[in-house]
């Protein structure tokens, strides 16, 4: 398969599974994905040991192949200014912070779009950016339960619900986010406009409750 997204630059401000899955898919399609990690510490999957490869978490290596990387402290002015400079020459920003975090840092979508009107912001959250759970953090285990996914797995109807072994809502949310970004890129090619893309672990769980 050809590198269809060659020339597309993605700033991945995401960690653990859902966001990095999306970034991984875009990188595999040829996009230049620059992973922005917090400092100190970096992506939490760096600490997912064992297994490891020469002391580096296998989970981290798996989720971040084909990506470039930079560490930024976005709580400091210098880090914010570097990020704003990067936005000027980027196409997509991918993040999975809690609702309002980017706005508190002074780099919400309104600010990004003034710097680069063609920028696409993709937000992955636990329960979406609206609704009663919008301010809550999200985790695969909880999303599998609250979406009803666990109710259709397990041994039989007389036994307790059972978690799907794989982090299914994380992975599916990454797939949904990548699909949304691809659609937004096509829309931008037609109109010249950037936009926000929003998906969630809850939405990803609902997908599997047919």
What are these regions (language model features)?
Residues 185-210:
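Substrate-binding/catalytic subdomain of NAD(P)-dependent oxidoreductase enzymes
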Residues 1-190:
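N-terminal helix-loop segment corresponding to the beta1-alpha1 unit
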